[in-house]
Amino acid sequence: MPSYHNTDKTLLGDARQSLQQAVDYSLGCQQPDGHWVAPVMADATFTAQYVFFKHQIPELSLDEDGPEIQRWLLGEQTADGSWTLAPDLPGNLSTTVEAYLALRILGVPKSDQAMLRARDFVVRNGGVEGVRFFTRFFLATFGLVPWTAIPQMPAELILLPTFMFLNIYVLSSWARSTLIPILLVRHHEPVYALPNGQSANNNFLDELWCNPGEKNIPFALPLWDLLRRYQWIEFAFTLLDHILALFGGLRRWPCRHMALKRCTAWLLEHQEESGDWAGFFPPIHGSIWALLLDGFSFQSEVIRLGMEALERLVVIDPKGKWVQSTVSPCWDTALMANALCDAGMSGDTRLAKATQWLRDRQLMVSHGDWRNYANTQQAGGWSFQYFNSFYPDVDDTAVVIMTLIKEDPNCTNSDCVMNGVEWMLGMQSRDGGWGAFDVNNNARWLHKIPFSDMDSLVDPSTSDVTGRILECLGLLLSQRKSPLSPRWRHRLQASSAKAIAFLAKEQESSGAWWGRWGNNYHYGTANVLRGLAWFAQTDPSAQMMCMRTLSWIDETQNADGGWGETLASYVDKSLAGLGRSTAAHTAWALESLLRFRLPSDQAIERGVRWLIDNQQPNVDGYYYGTKWQAGAGQGASWRFDHAYVGTGFPSVLYLGYPYYHHLFPIQALSRYIDKASRQGIETLRIPSSSAVILDRPNVLLMAMGSRGDIQVFLNVTKRLSSCRVRIATHPAHQAKVEGHGFEFYDVGGSPEVFSAALANGHGILRSIIDGRFRELQHLLRSIYRSFWVAALDDVQSHSPLKPESSSRPFIADVVVSGPSTSVHVHAAERAQAPLVIISTQPAIITGDFQSPLTMSRAQFNPSRLWNRISFHMLAFFDWLSFGPSFNRMRANSYQLRSLDLAWALFEFVKVSVPHVCLWSTSLAPKPEDWDNNVIIAGYSSMSDDADDVASKSLQAFLETRQPVVAISFGSATIEDPMKLIKLMSAALVKVGASSVVCRSWDSSFEAEADLPSNVFLVDSIPHGWLLQHVEGFVHHGGAGHTAAGAKAGVSQLVMPQFLDQFFWATKVSEMGLGPTPLPLRELFLDELAPRMEDLLSSKYTKACTNMALQLRGDVDGADVAGDEILRQVEAITTCCIFPELSAHWYCTESDLSLSGAAAASLVSSKEIQWQDLELRPAKDWEQQWRTVRSSSNLVRIWRAIVQLLYGFTTTILALFGWLKGTHGYLDGDRHLIKMEDPLRQARLEQAQFDLHLIHQACDSGSSTSLDAKIIENWKARKAVVIHEVFDDDSGASESSRSSLDGGHADSVLDIEEK
């Protein structure tokens, strides 16, 4: 064995040495034809059933291999006498009974100490009476259990057509291939001889029974018990089984002969040329057995080939002779080659040999059971085994495709890869996930069938397989050396979106994902994170899922630095992620963390150290293929025999893959070395005076509405001290915005005009229909255009000679907006920036209530259908009014493609934009049909202005006049405010009360002398203070007023006028916080006085007090909103040279991310050219639109209907002159390609500004030195290419390749200031 001398004693140096030894071990295990394979370990049942079979068939004998099998079986017995399903699990009753019977057949006497211990274990655990169905089935074939104790399994099942809800193809592939031979065996009901003779009531195992006199144990509960427990499906299947038993199992039924012939034909059709059936022991063994019972000669070709396939599963090693459940050459080869690609071996001839071996095994065949229900008929998958053409494996196919691309990126568009991708996409289930072998195979009710006590009859979508496919799709979408066509990209993005939605539903409360095919939560979680990592930067929901998971991984790390998990976590969820450390679990956890954290993270370094310290050289021997090689091999690996980390069927069958403990650590070490090597390259720090200006992301806040609306946004922006915030709003709010220290941008318009246009009280839909909304259109169009200008400064007008923050060109990095600012998504899309919507009113489609903007009365509509339609109607009329303007704006100002009405109705609502709702769930809970991107954050705590102090006269009024009611209508427009005040005063006089009126809503009356004596008029007063001194609150139902009243615990009378005021009025009444709402348009003295009396009664006190207590326990919604905005900011990629700066550029050749300053320096130094750089979007909106665009026929029909309706409506409106020139945007589309990209030009100018600013902060010598250091750093980083980018000629990861030889020393270079 070669010696490995490590001169670098750092963790990185040790990791390089460990990786080199692991790679050497891998190459030493490679087969001459290029592939890898290792034995698939499992429990003793397969070996025991192999013994049963050889004992049953006269032509077979156990004389030669019996002693070695006996030695292996006895060696697997545990100290308590049992046999387990896996090394770290307690004994299993069924496995122990089967192993015991096999040993008795092999001649071990029942008086042997090992057998006595086994007997004691079985009896202690309920005896043979408690074994599972398949064990009972095998016992019946020896007369140890009567056949009447076995459920009926009529062969006629195979005759049921595929369109029926029950047929053989609704079963999983493994269940189907195992069940059909069982149908034949069940028909024949054989009874074979045992060493004590042949008998239908054999007492050979009586010592294992608790009550040997009663062996006809029912396989299901009595029918009456099932009825009492409301187990209807179990009842139906059990009743059917009883009926079938009455008719002798239909053995003499006219169709039985046809069914038996079809079973036999099916088996012959599904036998591979090699003799295999599904490459799995149960169908191979069962098919040979069934065909022999059906009359086939043992010397026949089909039986001979089948026996060869069966014997290929046998393994002989130092422990003895045993039988694998299956073989895994394609799986082992794909995973190993994939790992070696990550280790930098792409392009190596040995790896090329492996990938060629994989290409040769692609299943381009015309048969396969998957064809019955798949969404495609294009073949192209890969199987798990050597010979299994009927059941390609989705999981294997994904890994093979990734391996082929990593080894040679030029093959991305090859027929081999594209056929595989086509087949893989066709296997996606309706729920968005993937199963392993079948599509939409989720009929879990089949597990209620009496013979399904292993819960393995279906192959539903699982998180681990879906995560792997998502990883494959992400890799395909990232390719630049051989990029996919737009059509393929669209298909992959749409498929990925469905997969991400599926994974969001499957994530558990801990943040982890259940692992179906590997142990367990660590496996499932690692697979999912490997997939989500490709989409986390552009998909907020994917990012949120990932962030939730990382803390769970931290919490499950063991004290020794590794990770592990017991298989008992499949039974007991409290054990999820817990167990003795193993190499595989540690590697899975590290792979997950390394995709989101720096390699210097403490948890990562401890995990890497565990892998290094637990690596072992091969001294005693190793598996070369499935054969044991004695002596030392080359390299080193990790121990694999102490834990099974693969899963066949949870709680029933677990698998030990030796290479799992080897190849996954290779990937983890490779990723660590790659990231640590990149981190070790010197990083440059810009002068602090420049950093203050440049290291501040630009946040654009678009706001429309009243003073109260703006106050909410101001509360949020106070949490963004690390950002440069620009608030674009009406000129009326300029003083308030600038008074809080934020940049103001004037977009025009007036909240008073908006309020007046909608003050009719009939809702926004009625306003649009009646034409009253028309007067706002021109004003709003102007405002919307101004919002875009606010997002992108005219950079030509900025001079770097003024190094204050406000002089730097403003280009929005994040856009924040309320839902009413309809242009927000267009501006964010053009700026390639993420969007955060902050709302004080429900604006998302739901069936729980209608759109608040369409409500014209204080009452919720019970129709969920109408409620959803109301949101679509609002979107329809909104698009009718502004859609053409938006499209002209998109074409002429934004340089974006036109959109249609179907986009507004069906697509925008599906985009996963973070939507922060600033109200409390105590008042308005989150509807169940809202997605995870919607956050009900809680009310924002309004900060009262310091100059709003109560006067002494007001305080005296409050003390002397009891009870007092506060009255405020915000900034609403009231036609005759004095008349309203006098009306309210009269009502209050009737109930003996006074009022404090806040007149911020109207200043048209001045003379206080005209006011009634029971009215006190104030210009401005903090609601938080005032409401503590009054007994009731009358207001218009604005979100802020409703919140203030609820927080104060005071009863409220709401007088809604328009928009969402009716929604909050209804909520107040619904929650018992005040009287029935009284709309302003229905205000009469006779109605008002009783409401005032009701308001001042004590009937609402308890509900109001409880609500106030609940709200005090809520977090501040402004904090949640601020955190969400900062999360979007933090997600922006950082520059690889100046890590303090955001990277808005990337090099198309190397994918390295660059800040504007670094890019400008490299361009000025002629290292690169601007055409070598592309803008790196902080959010890829084009991908978002393609992802959400549904291709289902139903949605296509709806789109067509909507477009026809829209075309008809716009034509009619055009005839009346409403919409003039509304289709001019089509010319804009034609002109779009010719115009210069304004964003790119702005970023280019900004980059030059930033570099100039940094140069100004340096002295002349440092400025020259800075450019030289940038060039040096750039060249070093080009030699270290990130793992995910495989676009150099060989496809190799240079960082991994170089990591085996050496790396760069860590250093940080500070640029000297003047």
Curated annotation (Swiss-Prot):
Membrane topology listed for this record: Multi-pass membrane protein
Family matches, as Gene3D superfamilies: 1.50.10.20, Glycogen Phosphorylase B
Presence of keyword Repeat: yes
InterPro entries: EryCIII-like_C, Glycosyltransferase_28, GlycoTrans_28_N, Hopene-cyclase, SQ_cyclase_C, SQ_cyclase_N, Squalene_cyclase, Terpenoid_cyclase/PrenylTrfase
Ranges that cross the membrane: 133-153, 155-175, 230-250, 1200-1220
Region (Glycosyltransferase): 681-1314
Residues the record marks as site: Transition state stabilizer: W331, F384, W517
Biased amino acid composition, Low complexity: 1292-1302
Any Pfam family matching the protein: SQHop_cyclase_N
PFTB-type repeats, residues: 19-62, 66-107, 260-300, 417-458, 546-597
Disordered: region residues: 1289-1314
Pathway: Secondary metabolite biosynthesis; terpenoid biosynthesis
UniProt cross-references to SUPFAM superfamilies, sorted A to Z: Terpenoid cyclases/Protein prenyltransferases, UDP-Glycosyltransferase/glycogen phosphorylase
UniProt region (Terpenne cyclase), positions on chain: 1-680
Top-level taxon of origin: Eukaryota
GO biological process: carbohydrate metabolic process; lipid glycosylation; triterpenoid biosynthetic process
GO molecular function, one term: sterol 3-beta-glucosyltransferase activity
Function recorded in the entry: Terpene cyclase-glycosyl transferase fusion protein; part of the gene cluster that mediates the biosynthesis of enfumafungin, a glycosylated fernene-type triterpenoid with potent antifungal activity, mediated by its interaction with beta-1,3-glucan synthase and the fungal cell wall. The pathway begins with the terpene cyclase-glycosyl transferase fusion protein that most likely uses 2,3-oxidosqualene as substrate and catalyzes glycosylation immediately after cyclization.
Protein name in UniProt: Enfumafungin synthase efuA
Source organism: Hormonema carpetanum
Gene, per the UniProt record: efuA
